[in-house]
Amino acid sequence: MRGMGNMQGMMKKMQKMQKEMMEAQEALNAEQFEGVAGGGMVKVTVSGQREVVSVNLDESVVDPEDIEMLQDLIVIATNEALKKVEEKTNSTMGKFTQGLNLPF
């Protein structure tokens, strides 16, 4: 019977960790991350859920003769913002898997 108490304790720890993970994920989803390109002339904001929230363009980068440059700047800013989300996700959620020796 001694092992049952240990098992219950482990289950409680797992439930607590699961709750903390859900709270951390919700907080992460509520955050916004900004990517910038062209010296701040293009700004893209994405949510922690990796959805584009806004795109802000300085008038000076809107050149009908050079749409490709504007497209490139938007891509760069978007990728930067998404990278920030990924880094924050890894650092936040990594706390929960650290030391578990999971096979994946």
UniProtKB/Swiss-Prot annotation:
SUPFAM superfamilies: YbaB-like (SSF82607). Keywords: Cytoplasm, DNA-binding. Binds to DNA and alters its conformation. May be involved in regulation of gene expression, nucleoid organization and DNA protection. One of its GO terms (cellular component) is cytosol. GO terms for molecular function: DNA binding. This is Nucleoid-associated protein Bsph_0039. Coiled coil: none annotated. Residues 1-12 have a biased composition (Low complexity). It is found in: Cytoplasm, Nucleoid. Homodimer. Belongs to the YbaB/EbfC family. HAMAP family: DNA_YbaB_EbfC. Its main location: cytoplasm. InterPro entries: YbaB-like_sf, YbaB/EbfC. It comes from the Bacteria. Residues 1-22 are annotated as: Disordered.
